[in-house]
Protein backbone atom coordinates (compact mmCIF):
# COMPACT_ATOMS: atom_id res chain seq x y z
CA UNK A 1 0.00 0.00 0.00
CA UNK A 2 1.26 3.44 -0.94
CA UNK A 3 1.47 6.25 1.55
CA UNK A 4 -0.58 9.19 0.21
CA UNK A 5 0.38 12.81 0.65
CA UNK A 6 -0.40 16.16 -0.96
CA UNK A 7 2.14 18.31 -2.74
CA UNK A 8 3.06 21.41 -0.75
CA UNK A 9 1.19 24.40 -2.16
CA UNK A 10 -0.52 22.06 -4.62
CA UNK A 11 2.48 22.15 -6.98
CA UNK A 12 4.61 19.12 -7.76
CA UNK A 13 7.95 19.90 -9.41
CA UNK A 14 9.57 16.88 -11.02
CA UNK A 15 13.29 17.56 -11.26
CA UNK A 16 15.66 19.69 -9.23
CA UNK A 17 17.86 21.11 -11.98
CA UNK A 18 17.83 24.60 -13.47
CA UNK A 19 14.15 24.66 -14.48
CA UNK A 20 12.70 22.77 -11.53
CA UNK A 21 14.56 24.66 -8.84
CA UNK A 22 13.81 27.99 -10.53
CA UNK A 23 10.06 27.26 -10.60
CA UNK A 24 10.09 26.19 -6.94
CA UNK A 25 12.03 29.33 -6.02
CA UNK A 26 9.59 31.56 -7.95
CA UNK A 27 6.66 30.05 -6.04
CA UNK A 28 8.19 31.49 -2.88
CA UNK A 29 6.21 31.08 0.32
CA UNK A 30 3.41 29.28 -1.50
CA UNK A 31 5.80 26.34 -1.61
CA UNK A 32 6.06 23.25 -3.76
CA UNK A 33 7.16 19.65 -3.51
CA UNK A 34 10.32 18.90 -5.49
CA UNK A 35 11.08 15.33 -6.54
CA UNK A 36 14.75 14.88 -7.33
CA UNK A 37 17.39 12.17 -7.20
CA UNK A 38 19.86 14.69 -5.77
CA UNK A 39 19.53 17.19 -2.92
CA UNK A 40 21.36 19.86 -4.89
CA UNK A 41 21.13 21.86 -8.10
CA UNK A 42 24.25 21.47 -10.23
CA UNK A 43 25.43 24.61 -12.00
CA UNK A 44 26.70 22.88 -15.14
CA UNK A 45 28.30 25.94 -16.83
CA UNK A 46 31.01 25.81 -14.15
CA UNK A 47 31.88 22.12 -14.60
CA UNK A 48 34.91 22.85 -16.84
CA UNK A 49 36.35 25.08 -14.10
CA UNK A 50 35.84 22.31 -11.55
CA UNK A 51 37.50 19.82 -13.89
CA UNK A 52 40.52 22.09 -14.42
CA UNK A 53 40.95 22.65 -10.70
CA UNK A 54 40.37 26.41 -10.79
CA UNK A 55 37.16 25.96 -8.81
CA UNK A 56 36.38 23.48 -6.06
CA UNK A 57 33.52 21.07 -6.91
CA UNK A 58 31.55 22.26 -3.87
CA UNK A 59 31.22 25.66 -5.55
CA UNK A 60 29.26 24.31 -8.53
CA UNK A 61 26.37 22.92 -6.46
CA UNK A 62 23.63 24.70 -4.55
CA UNK A 63 21.62 22.78 -1.93
CA UNK A 64 17.95 22.69 -2.98
CA UNK A 65 16.81 23.27 0.60
CA UNK A 66 18.84 26.48 0.67
CA UNK A 67 17.78 27.64 -2.79
CA UNK A 68 14.08 26.81 -2.27
CA UNK A 69 13.51 27.21 1.48
CA UNK A 70 9.72 26.92 1.28
CA UNK A 71 9.76 23.75 -0.80
CA UNK A 72 9.50 20.20 0.44
CA UNK A 73 12.17 17.94 -1.05
CA UNK A 74 11.45 14.30 -1.81
CA UNK A 75 14.70 12.54 -2.63
CA UNK A 76 13.55 9.84 -4.97
CA UNK A 77 12.51 8.72 -8.40
CA UNK A 78 9.26 9.28 -10.25
CA UNK A 79 7.89 5.87 -11.22
CA UNK A 80 4.40 6.81 -12.44
CA UNK A 81 2.44 9.92 -13.33
CA UNK A 82 -1.33 9.97 -13.82
CA UNK A 83 -2.49 13.36 -15.12
CA UNK A 84 -6.14 12.28 -15.01
CA UNK A 85 -6.17 11.64 -11.26
CA UNK A 86 -3.38 14.19 -10.69
CA UNK A 87 -1.20 11.77 -8.78
CA UNK A 88 2.45 10.83 -9.03
CA UNK A 89 4.13 7.77 -7.60
CA UNK A 90 7.54 8.49 -6.10
CA UNK A 91 9.96 5.84 -4.89
CA UNK A 92 12.31 6.92 -2.07
CA UNK A 93 14.70 5.11 0.26
CA UNK A 94 12.05 5.17 3.00
CA UNK A 95 9.16 3.92 0.87
CA UNK A 96 6.88 4.62 -2.04
CA UNK A 97 4.53 7.60 -1.95
CA UNK A 98 1.53 8.64 -3.98
CA UNK A 99 1.62 12.44 -4.22
CA UNK A 100 -1.55 14.36 -5.12
CA UNK A 101 -1.08 17.65 -6.92
CA UNK A 102 -3.06 20.49 -8.51
CA UNK A 103 -0.29 21.55 -10.92
CA UNK A 104 2.79 19.65 -12.03
CA UNK A 105 6.00 20.86 -13.62
CA UNK A 106 7.97 18.36 -15.69
CA UNK A 107 11.58 19.51 -15.50
CA UNK A 108 13.40 16.20 -15.67
CA UNK A 109 16.49 17.48 -17.44
CA UNK A 110 18.25 16.33 -20.54
CA UNK A 111 20.68 13.73 -21.76
CA UNK A 112 23.89 14.36 -23.63
CA UNK A 113 23.92 13.46 -27.28
CA UNK A 114 27.20 12.56 -28.89
CA UNK A 115 27.39 13.95 -32.41
CA UNK A 116 28.71 11.70 -35.19
CA UNK A 117 32.02 13.53 -35.53
CA UNK A 118 35.02 11.32 -36.37
CA UNK A 119 37.27 10.89 -33.33
CA UNK A 120 34.87 12.53 -30.86
CA UNK A 121 34.00 9.30 -29.05
CA UNK A 122 37.68 8.44 -28.56
CA UNK A 123 39.06 11.87 -27.74
CA UNK A 124 36.20 14.13 -26.63
CA UNK A 125 35.21 14.94 -23.08
CA UNK A 126 31.68 15.67 -21.96
CA UNK A 127 30.54 17.40 -18.79
CA UNK A 128 27.07 16.49 -17.59
CA UNK A 129 27.46 15.85 -13.87
CA UNK A 130 29.89 16.42 -11.04
CA UNK A 131 31.52 13.00 -11.52
CA UNK A 132 32.50 14.03 -15.07
CA UNK A 133 34.44 17.00 -13.72
Q: In which residue ranges do the predicted regions lie?
A:
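Beta1-alpha1 glycine-rich phosphate/pyrophosphate-binding loop at the start
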Residues: 2-74
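FAD-binding core/adjacent interface of flavoenzyme oxidoreductases
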Residues: 1-8, 72-133
